[in-house]
């Protein structure tokens, strides 16, 4: 069929048809019947217009080879065969100059004599059927329809055939010839059967009353009525060339598609400014634990009892002093708050029976740290809507921060192995169905790779802290409750261990809405000297509270112990997500699973065992300035887990925006790597959208710098 088309039709027509198909992502070599149909339709449109002119007196005349100098104007404007943007431009200018109503779909011709658009149809079926489908699709009184068939029949709106008998006969003869040529080559039957109807004829379904009003209210912008929107949706072709899509979406849009080459992308611009600071809800790599092994004390499992027991394992407490003040805070209050915690814990121990929870005295330092009475008084809107200068608070633009090296160190640390086991095998949930055998095997392998990982410790710590804080926020709304920060794990030998990281004191927590904030003060133990990277600890006041003896290869050394204190806040919805951090295990397991699936489909057998047990194989982990980093399958599991955990710990609007927008650029770059010749429009706008998310968030800035490494290496 393809050869027939190329022999049978004028090369210009063939070229236009190929272009039209390409615009809709169709291949003339594969969809040969469609190729033939498009060429036929184009040829009929050109024949319809050929030799028809309008003379100086605006009379319609037919000239086949007359005086080339006569002042003649073509009677028909050909719209079919132009690219969509150009075609709409022509339609728009005709409507503007003649005042004819603008059609909803691109017609084929415009008749300057009758002042109307014409839709030409060529059908291999019954002309009446095709005519009805066309009329139903374009739903316009203004556009004239003229249908031809390969059997010499025709049908036109109001039986007005526009052209003289002879011109129409020429078209019918040509169609008959094409049919015979196809039949003689054995192509006709397949061509005849391949014709698909226009959109099915739908009943007119009227919406009235309330539903109609709701429909009119909920239209997207720029649509005046439901009909107007419906026509747009009906006429929208769902696949094909992007220029065509854009010109369909809006007649005003004129996008130029630029090729995306290796030299096209530039690196993302990271912001300048002071280095970014730590903003997680609890310390990560800098946290220090006071631990008890094999806990068996009275009240074991009650957080306050566990905390007091852990505190007693340390003997190096000393008079606290401030070593790194908080720039904006009242630092003596932080110091007093810690002293108050120590004193009140001491009081508990002096009581006969230790209580299950501890509410702190509402001292001035805690009231200050927890922002008590700081919130502006809420006034009912009804009472103040007449105030003339009512306005929202002016809020400052966030200050730009530059990427600091500490966040990469944090990430590296999160990927490392610890010497404790943080999740039991059943943490991901038991099998339900018998088919789950392979899934269980994968889960067990994966769990073995990540159970010792520091990111898993962060998950369990996050789950514990958020659960405890949400519980306290609901159970003791008005109290300044003391909440120990605890985690539980097992040693390599399988012994149970309870760890204390520090304490939280929660403020008033009348949380009605998901986003209502509860303030808290966190006090966390650490051996990290804050003076080494003061920019990281901008939001903290750091005290030195003791000396710890550490065993090293050269014997025991004494190191100062610090307490990192800061005011922080969270909300019900954030705590809910924090409680569900175990989902990170599932997310990274699914990513690993898709890698195994890809491998298995190549080898045509389940590759789970080989995947995890072949220790010699390395896998790509990520990009760094040095190039693609590779590592063992365990390292891949832990890296994916750490990414998922950091997305949770450092969740923010900046991260949401960056992930969504940078993904577009990533897909374009991937397409270039796969030699798919991607094209783009408004690449500058995409860069702008990505870069407006690069403000001051450490995790987003790190991801942006990784993205730059990827761009540099991917497109070499």
Swiss-Prot record:
Assembly information from the UniProt record: Influenza RNA polymerase is composed of three subunits: PB1, PB2 and PA. Interacts (via C-terminus) with PB1 (via N-terminus).
Renumbered ranges of motif Nuclear localization signal 2 (NLS2): 184-247
Motif (Nuclear localization signal 1 (NLS1)) on chain: 124-139
Active site (UniProt): 134
Molecular function terms, GO-annotated: endonuclease activity; metal ion binding; RNA binding
Positions with a binding annotation for Mn(2+) 1: 41, 80, 108, 119-120
InterPro entries tied to this protein: INFV_PA, PA/PA-X, PA/PA-X_sf
Descriptive protein name: Polymerase acidic protein
Summary of the function given for this chain in its UniProt record: Plays an essential role in viral RNA transcription and replication by forming the heterotrimeric polymerase complex together with PB1 and PB2 subunits. The complex transcribes viral mRNAs by using a unique mechanism called cap-snatching. It consists in the hijacking and cleavage of host capped pre-mRNAs. These short capped RNAs are then used as primers for viral mRNAs. The PB2 subunit is responsible for the binding of the 5' cap of cellular pre-mRNAs which are subsequently cleaved after 10-13 nucleotides by the PA subunit that carries the endonuclease activity.
Gene: PA
Binding-site residues, Mn(2+) 2: 80, 108
Organism: Influenza A virus (strain A/Vietnam/1203/2004 H5N1)
Family: Belongs to the influenza viruses PA family.
Cofactor notes: Binds 2 manganese ions per subunit.
């Amino acid at each position: 069929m393809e050869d027939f088309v190329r022999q049978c039709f004028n090369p210009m027509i063939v070229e236009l048809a190929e272009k039209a198909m390409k615009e809709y992502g169709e291949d003339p070599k594969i969809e040969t019947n469609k190729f033939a149909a498009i060429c036929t339709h184009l040829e009929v449109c050109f024949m319809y217009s050929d030799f028809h002119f309008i003379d100086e007196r605006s009379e319609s005349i037919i000239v086949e080879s007359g005086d080339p100098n006569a002042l003649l104007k073509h009677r028909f404007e050909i719209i079919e065969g132009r690219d969509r943007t150009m075609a709409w431009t022509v339609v728009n200018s005709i409507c503007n100059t003649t005042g004819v109503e603008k059609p909803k779909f691109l017609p084929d011709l415009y008749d300057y004599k009758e002042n109307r658009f014409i839709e030409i149809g060529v059908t291999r079926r019954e002309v009446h059927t095709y005519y009805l489908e066309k009329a139903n699709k374009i739903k316009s009184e203004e556009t004239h329809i003229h249908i031809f068939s390969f059997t010499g029949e025709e049908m036109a709106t109001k039986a007005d055939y526009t052209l003289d008998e002879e011109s129409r006969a020429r078209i019918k003869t040509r169609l008959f010839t094409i049919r015979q040529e196809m039949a003689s080559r054995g192509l006709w039957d397949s061509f005849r059967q391949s014709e698909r109807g226009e959109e099915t004829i739908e009943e007119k379904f009227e919406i009235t009353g309330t539903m109609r009003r709701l429909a009119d209210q909920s239209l997207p912008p720029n649509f005046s009525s439901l009909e107007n929107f419906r026509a747009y949706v009906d006429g929208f072709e769902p696949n094909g060339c992007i220029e065509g899509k854009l010109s369909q979406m809006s007649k005003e849009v004129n996008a130029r598609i630029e090729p995306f080459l290796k030299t096209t992308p530039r690196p993302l611009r990271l912001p300048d400014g002071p280095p970014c600071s730590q903003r997680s809800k609890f310390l990560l790599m800098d946290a220090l634990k006071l631990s008890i092994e094999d806990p068996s004390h009275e009240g074991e499992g009650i957080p306050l009892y566990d905390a007091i027991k852990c505190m007693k394992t340390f003997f190096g407490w000393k008079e606290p002093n401030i070593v790194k003040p908080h720039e904006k805070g009242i630092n003596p209050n932080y110091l007093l708050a810690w002293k108050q915690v120590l004193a009140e814990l001491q009081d508990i121990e002096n009581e006969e029976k230790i209580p299950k929870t501890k509410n702190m005295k509402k001292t001035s330092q805690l009231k200050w740290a927890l922002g008590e009475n700081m919130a502006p008084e809420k006034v009912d809107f009804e009472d103040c809507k007449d105030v003339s200068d009512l306005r929202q608070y002016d809020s400052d633009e966030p200050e730009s921060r530059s990427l600091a090296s500490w966040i990469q160190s944090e990430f590296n640390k999160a990927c490392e192995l610890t010497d404790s086991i943080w999740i039991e095998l059943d943490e991901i949930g038991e099998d339900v169905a018998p088919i789950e055998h392979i899934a269980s095997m994968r889960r067990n392998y994966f769990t073995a790779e990540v159970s010792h990982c520091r990111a898993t410790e962060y998950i369990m710590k996050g789950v514990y802290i958020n659960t405890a804080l949400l519980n306290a926020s609901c159970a003791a709304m008005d109290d300044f409750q003391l909440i120990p920060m605890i985690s539980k794990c097992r040693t390599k030998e399988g012994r149970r261990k309870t760890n204390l990281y520090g304490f939280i004191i929660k403020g008033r927590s009348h949380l009605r809405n998901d986003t209502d904030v509860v303030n808290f003060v966190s006090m966390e133990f650490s051996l990290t000297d804050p003076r080494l990277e003061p920019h990281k600890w901008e939001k903290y006041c750091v005290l030195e509270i003791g000396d710890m003896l550490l065993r090293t290869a050269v014997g025991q050394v004494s190191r100062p112990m610090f307490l990192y204190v800061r005011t922080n806040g969270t909300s019900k919805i954030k705590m809910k997500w924090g409680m569900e951090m175990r989902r990170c295990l599932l997310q990274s397991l699914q990513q690993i699973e898709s890698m195994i699936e890809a491998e298995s489909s190549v080898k045509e057998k389940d590759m789970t065992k080989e995947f995890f047990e072949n220790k010699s194989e390395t896998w790509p982990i990520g990009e760094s300035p040095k190039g693609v980093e590779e590592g063992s399958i365990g390292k891949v599991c832990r890296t994916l887990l750490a990414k998922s955990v950091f997305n949770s710990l450092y969740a923010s609007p900046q991260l949401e925006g960056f992930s969504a927008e940078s993904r577009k650029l990533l897909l374009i770059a991937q397409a270039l790597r796969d030699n798919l010749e991607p094209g783009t429009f408004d690449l500058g706008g995409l860069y702008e959208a990505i870069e407006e998310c690069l403000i001051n968030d450490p995790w987003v800035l790190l991801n942006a710098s990784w993205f730059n490494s990827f761009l540099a290496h991917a497109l070499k």
